[in-house]
From Swiss-Prot:
Superkingdom: Bacteria
Stated name of the protein: Large ribosomal subunit protein bL34
Family membership: Belongs to the bacterial ribosomal protein bL34 family.
Cross-referenced PROSITE patterns: RIBOSOMAL_L34
Organism per entry: Buchnera aphidicola subsp. Acyrthosiphon pisum (strain APS) (Acyrthosiphon pisum symbiotic bacterium)
Keyword terms of this UniProt record: Ribonucleoprotein, Ribosomal protein
Gene it is expressed from: rpmH
HAMAP family for the chain: Ribosomal_bL34
InterPro entries the record matches: Ribosomal_bL34, Ribosomal_bL34_CS
Pfam families on file: Ribosomal_L34
Amino acid sequence: MKRTFQPSILKRNRSHGFRIRMATKNGRYILSRRRAKLRTRLTVSSK
């Protein structure tokens, strides 16, 4: 049986990346909450 998680960096960034987060109001809210928590990585695409 095929496993459910088939990693793809491109798909990951397109759904959870920085530019997608910035594109919506709720996405910007997520980033602001992560900045408030002083997260070193705001999104999966940031290194």
